[in-house]
Amino acid sequence: MPGLFDTLNLATRSMQAQQAGVTVSGQNLANINNPAYSRQRVNLQTSDPVPLVGGIQGTGVEVAGIQQIRDGLLDNQIRDEGSVGGFWTTAQSALGNTQTELGEFLNGTAAASNGSANTSSTASAQGLSTQLNNLFSAFESVASDPTSLSQRQVLVSQAQSLAGSFNQIATRLDGVNQNLNSSVSNDVDSANKLLSDIASLNSDIAKTEAATGSTANDLRDLRQQKLESLAQLTNLQTSTASDGSLTVSIGGVAMVSGSKITDTLQAYDPGNGQLQVRAAVAGTALTLTGGSIAGAIDTRDGALANLRTGLDNLASQLIGKVNSVYSAGYDLNGNTGADFFTGTNAATIGVNANLANDPSQVQAAGAAGSVGDNTVALALAQLAQQANGALGNQTFSGAYAQTVTDLGNSLANANDQVANHDAVSSMLAQQRDSVSGVSMEEELTNLMTYQKAYQASAQIISTVNLMLQTVIAMKTT
């Protein structure tokens, strides 16, 4: 039959098991505000029994292991949703900055119709839409009073303001474009740093788990945090090896395999000044569909490029159409053949420098020496209402309104996508918190349970100690 020392060992093992429980609960409570931490649980099991003549004698309890409470599927969903959020948050920010630089406030519901500029986008007082209207109004004012130098001076000033706005917008859009290129470059560097961290954690996890036979819970938490940070930069795929390490692939190219970095991301210029991303070792151009890197590239090459193309086309057509009519006109001195606008696009459009110094050189008449002739000025004013095939059969104002509308729709879509992501992300976070989060009430209850069990085990030891003293006293008498 079992002796007192067997009972003493049983109680000692019980105290050790309860102490492990207290330690784990303490670890959970210490990390209650750590968003990367997943709750841990001590798993207890009956220790191996001892066969006796009279039957089987239990030996108490022991720690089977410390389990990390995680839902792998939920973790993957959160990681993937992070890529969605990274993409659309970057797009939203870039499009919002573009709206600011354009000088128009967009609500995303504007729609150009009948070639007019009447849309539900709200133009600022000095926006391009207003200045286009001011230009053609100034042509009309010259036509109404063709001998007035002051009206001609107003026309030149309005044209200079319009050209200056085109120039400023082009410069600002270049700045947005450069910022997106910088974002791509910086995010690629950040992604490579995270890949290096993940490879290092893979090594630590594999070594720790091989040496201890236990799951490296805290290291796995940190690796998951790194993966989620990486997913915000780019979409990725993972697979788990038998030693607990991960293989991380981006765009179909393995970047990390166990403790080794097999490839890295590289931002490169394909020759057009617009950074793209490839695998540095494999040399493969990567098609990224999620994360902030893809969001920056997609916005830059999509909505921003379309906006710039639309503005350049508008400026080019304005220059060409106005100059075509204007160059056939005559100024107050009988001169003809000069152009009104200079340049070829939004960045280079300007006004004939001679006109600023001498508004009498404005060519408003249809024939030389015809005092009061407004033929050309009137024809120029009428350009405002003429549909242009190169502008999608829209007027100048209508084409600009459509360009603004397209940007507004892109921004509205990005806003919707970010709102949807926030809702999904919040729901997933709540689900994970219910699984892996630390509950203070639960841990305090566990602490009390472990404490009482520990005290009970200590009482067993005290009782056995008294019994041993009795036995010893009997043998000494």
Task: Kindly give the residue locations of the regions a language model identified.
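Structural signature of extracellular appendage/secretion-system components
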Residues: 1-477
